[in-house]
């Protein structure tokens, strides 16, 4: 398994161009000045010249990217031609989506957000980038677990899809998870009522129980025993659900300014705040180890039912062409837990928040649901237009898991009237796409 620290360091290595982007001006210049001031031998002179040569080459490359590639025609803020610091600073602050969305509103559906990165929100362009058989590819980051989300080879990705196809089919999910999910709903509602009854102001932490519920739903799909071993049943906290977000924030700091990241880790024993930012992996070390254990167990459970297992090489086979190792399955399970639990919980929080803000809609929704008779199933709720409208609109505006989805152009490609050079990152974001006024009437409503 890949630890949080090794993943961060590998990501830093892969983003060395970005590190040069924000450290060359400061660190290289300071070293050069110090050497020039302290000229005691020819060695210092050569060292100063070498540093300034690196600085010169770095800026020459920056100018080339800014003015000598087809990306110079793509609209965007002036500084995006030279540096990705504006984007990385908003990554650190957790404002990337708002930042990019603001640029879309100002510059249009295709905008340059970094020297070698563009963001798009045009539906036709998005379809081209993510279409079946597209030439655009994911880029595997060093240190990133080789899982179904990060894999870049289309053939290998299809193998994984076929391996999990039956487990994620509607028929299998309804048969294996619907009764358990209904019980999870009862547990979450009862917990919210209990918390409200125990508090003097009769309030409850809806966010907490929605996040735990979402994680338990993902747990049920993967493990099949969430009502006895899930987060709600074992009285865990939301920290386990959002641990990945904290690790992403630490990684964002490492990519934004590596010297500051190292300084923060060095000073972290002096401040709990610094420790929570720069040494998150220590705070959640127990969770990480528990996750390792669970993934090892899970690699022998739900997804491997009705498969053939070879003890010699640790491979599960659906057929001669479709097979995965226990390590592959363990990596994928990590992804399924993160990509399933947090988005389900976050979307549910936004749904409740939106409905409570609109009393008329709340009354209509409650009246529609009150007309249902037991047993309430997925099939019966699918017939409720107001409920489904609320769900779809919540997912459109506030759907969980709305991180960017970068793809890389292998060859020069025309997108939306602009030529995208090979190697350029083309980033799509469901939040920006779903709020594009060219695609939706009054998208913010």
Curated annotation (Swiss-Prot):
What job does this protein perform?
Methylphloroacetophenone oxidase; part of the gene cluster that mediates the biosynthesis of usnic acid, a dibenzofuran lichen product possessing a broad spectrum of biological activities. Two genes, mpas and mpao, comprise the usnic acid biosynthetic gene cluster with a single post-PKS enzyme, the methylphloracetophenone oxidase (mpao). The methylphloroacetophenone synthase (mpas) is a non-reducing polyketide synthase that produces methylphloracetophenone from acetate via a methylated tetraketide intermediate.
Report membrane topology.
Answer: Single-pass membrane protein
Question: Which GO cellular component does the record give, naming just one?
Answer: membrane
Q: How is it used?
A: Lichens belonging to usnic acid-containing genera have been used as crude drugs throughout the world. Usnic acid is a potentially interesting candidate for such activities as anti-inflammatory, analgesic, healing, antioxidant, antimicrobial, antiprotozoal, antiviral, larvicidal and UV protection. However, it was shown to be toxic for the liver and to lead to contact allergy.
Q: Which Cys pairs are S-S linked?
A: none
Subcellular location field: Membrane
Which pathway features in its UniProt record? Secondary metabolite biosynthesis
Entry annotated with the keyword Membrane: yes
Q: What is the species listed in this Swiss-Prot or TrEMBL entry? A: Cladonia uncialis (Cup lichen)
Q: Where are the transmembrane segments?
A: 25-45
Keyword Transmembrane tagged: yes
- Entry's Pfam families? p450
- Family that this chain belongs to: Belongs to the cytochrome P450 family.
Q: What is its EC number?
A: 1.-.-.-
This chain's protein is named Methylphloroacetophenone oxidase
**Keyword terms:** Glycoprotein, Membrane, Oxidoreductase, Transmembrane, Transmembrane helix
Superkingdom is: Eukaryota
Q: What class of enzyme is it?
A: oxidoreductase
Encoding gene, per UniProt annotation: MPAO
Q: What's one GO MF term for it?
A: iron ion binding
